[in-house]
């Protein structure tokens, strides 16, 4: 399903909607009127709630390639090289044509897993809080995606591992494969770090480099 409109959430508050104008090939953002009356001002330099312009649609940037036709203050939530590789693998696995993909589809895929405070609804379903991660399988699959890129083909038994990799690895920035995880130092149990509230767990970024795990 191709996303044409997304709720933009900040700390459980809907700050506005991001929509895609298919005819013009550009996105536009509209503040939630109820949010404009509050005290939060998430984008004070470029789209302040105090500005009269915030009462009108804010168009995406069609000139700067980096922003991918999104308003600059939302484009920063797009994944970097590694997250894009995972997304591309997911797209191929689900039979979605590349020409059907808009920036909104990518943000919808990120959902609640972004590195910043913004969340994009609808979200891509991830692994549940109770599920543990198999680091050996994650590492092997991450290396294959990184090395084979668009030529990678998932085996039937790798589908669940791919879901886990999506849940932990799509928002971490940079070129190299990474994952955001939560680890219990006593039991050595590892879970997704994209879900808050794991008691007794430390959160860190895991970097896959030549099948060696680096912890930060």
What is the predicted function of each stretch?
Residues 1-216:
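Phosphate/dinucleotide-binding and metal-coordinating scaffold of catalytic cores
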């Amino acid at each position: 399903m191709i996303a044409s409109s997304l709720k933009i959430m900040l700390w459980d508050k809907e700050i506005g909607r991001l929509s895609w104008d298919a005819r013009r090939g550009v996105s536009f953002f509209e503040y939630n009127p109820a949010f404009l009356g509050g005290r939060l001002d998430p984008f004070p330099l470029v789209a302040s709630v105090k500005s009269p312009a915030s009462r009108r649609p804010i168009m995406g940037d069609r000139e700067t390639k980096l922003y991918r036709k999104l308003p600059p203050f939302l484009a920063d939530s797009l994944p970097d090289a590694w997250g894009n590789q995972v997304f591309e693998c997911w797209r191929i696995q689900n039979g979605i044509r590349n020409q059907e993909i808009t920036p909104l589809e990518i943000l919808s895929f990120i959902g609640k897993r972004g590195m910043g405070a913004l969340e994009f609804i609808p979200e891509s379903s991830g692994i549940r809080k109770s599920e543990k991660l198999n680091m050996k399988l994650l590492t092997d699959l991450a290396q294959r995606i990184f090395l084979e890129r668009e030529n990678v083909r998932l085996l039937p038994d790798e589908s669940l591992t791919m879901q886990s990799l999506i849940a932990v690895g799509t928002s971490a920035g940079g070129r190299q494969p990474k994952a955001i995880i939560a680890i219990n130092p006593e039991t050595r149990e590892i879970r997704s770090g994209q879900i808050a509230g794991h008691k007794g767990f430390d959160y860190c970024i895991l970097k896959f480099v030549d099948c060696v795990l680096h912890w930060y």
